[in-house]
């Protein structure tokens, strides 16, 4: 492919002049413009994504040296990232032998490819999602070529390299968002965090200090910052998924069993998947994303998450309260979890102070509504 690409790009201007250039005597009036000439195009078809971009920009992104290696790493990483995203939706093309046909039909990755496509942008934009494609500007095309393939360890933790940046994953998220609970510019970013989180607080786009302020404020409604709101969805992943962010699984059933949002989205697509088990209160969905989310997550976790969602400013209606109350109450303070603490647990580095005499003394000072604790 790289050899053909190099040869093709070398002939672009000549081919344009021969086929598209308007001639007057010895002059070509319609001169070649590499940003607009329709010949300057290459299509790269992958398992779940098609990249349609200027050939010269793909070649420029490959740089010098091991161009074929960089191309291979790039297409492999795109396939891996899409598989990761789809597994968190409970979608895959990998099913255990003997899986019921109806399960396969309802939970298979869509056959239609997503398309990352070079587009002329409207004012101020460099990337967007629309229809069944992601539009990117000229300068963003080169960034599709990875300089270092992501390295993922056996626990699903990103240890080196990177995927394709926040913007691409953000726009893909717009395309694959689950409509029953989607919040624009929030839930689509769950996929962007999946692509970059490495088990540390610094690797996510939001601030855990802002999360703490929200969940201790007692205020109803969403936080004003969409990235802070994203923290709620991420805390649910941290609380209920046993692996790190990039962990994928061999079959649909394994992904369903291990990924909270795989169950959430499966139940959203087909509530009967939950209801067929004969729950005390069946899952029904409404036109309200907040009520849907609370019901879906509680169903997926098999926990009454009233306290968690209330801390985040959600107000369950009577039907949602009834649905969540059939489950055992979640007693863990999930609204305080962060990446660092969860990584410490996964790596068996967390400290348990239960039963230990660790405080020699506590000094309490109060001034109006401020309380200062000094522990020794």
Give, region by region, the residue ranges found by the protein language model.
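Beta-strand-enriched, solvent-exposed domains that form extended recognition/catalytic surfaces
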Residues: 1-10, 14, 374-376
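Catalytic cores of extracellular degradative/oxidative enzymes
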Residues: 22-253, 257-261, 265
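Short, flexible/disordered intra-domain loops and linkers
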Residues: 62-67, 247-250, 276-287, 320, ...
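Long, domain-scale functional regions
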Residues: 71-75, 79, 257, 279-280, ...
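Acidic helix/loop microenvironments that form the catalytic cleft of cell-wall polysaccharide enzymes
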Residues: 192, 258-278, 313
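Active-site rim elements
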Residues: 217-224, 279-285, 294-296
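Beta/coil-rich, acidic/histidine-enriched accessory regions frequently appended to metallopeptidases
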Residues: 285-375
């Amino acid at each position: 492919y790289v050899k053909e690409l190099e040869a093709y790009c070398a002939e672009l201007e000549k081919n344009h002049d021969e086929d598209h250039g308007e001639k007057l005597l010895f002059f070509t009036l319609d001169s070649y413009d590499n940003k607009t000439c329709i010949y300057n195009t290459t299509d790269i078809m992958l398992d779940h994504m098609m990249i349609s971009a200027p050939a010269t920009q793909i070649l420029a992104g490959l740089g010098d040296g091991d161009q074929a290696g960089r191309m291979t790493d790039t297409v492999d990483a795109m396939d891996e990232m899409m598989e990761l995203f789809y597994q968190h939706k409970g979608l895959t093309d990998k099913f255990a032998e003997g899986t019921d046909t109806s399960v396969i039909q309802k939970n298979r990755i869509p056959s239609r490819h997503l398309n990352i496509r070079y587009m002329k942008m409207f004012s101020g934009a460099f990337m967007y999602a629309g229809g069944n494609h992601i539009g990117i500007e000229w300068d963003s095309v080169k960034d599709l070529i990875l300089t270092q393939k992501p390295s993922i360890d056996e626990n699903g933790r990103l240890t080196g390299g990177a995927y394709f940046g926040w913007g691409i994953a953000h726009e893909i998220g717009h395309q694959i968002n689950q409509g029953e609970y989607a919040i624009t510019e929030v839930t689509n970013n769950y996929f962007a965090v999946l692509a970059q989180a490495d088990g540390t607080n610094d690797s996510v786009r939001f601030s855990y200090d802002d999360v703490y302020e929200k969940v201790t404020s007692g205020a109803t409604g969403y936080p004003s910052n969409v990235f802070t709101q994203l923290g709620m969805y991420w805390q649910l992943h941290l609380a209920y998924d046993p692996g790190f962010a990039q962990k994928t699984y061999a079959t649909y059933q394994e992904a369903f069993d291990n990924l909270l949002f795989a169950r959430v989205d499966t139940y959203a697509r087909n509530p009967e998947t939950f209801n067929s088990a004969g729950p005390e209160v069946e899952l029904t969905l409404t036109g309200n994303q907040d009520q849907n989310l609370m019901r879906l997550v509680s169903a997926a976790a098999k926990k009454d998450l009233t306290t968690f969602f209330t801390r985040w400013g959600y107000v369950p209606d009577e039907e949602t309260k009834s649905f969540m109350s059939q489950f055992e109450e979640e007693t863990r303070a999930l609204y305080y979890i962060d990446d660092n603490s969860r990584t410490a647990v996964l790596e068996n580095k967390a400290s348990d102070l239960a039963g230990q005499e660790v405080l020699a003394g506590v000094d309490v000072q109060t001034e109006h509504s401020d309380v200062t604790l000094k522990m020794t």
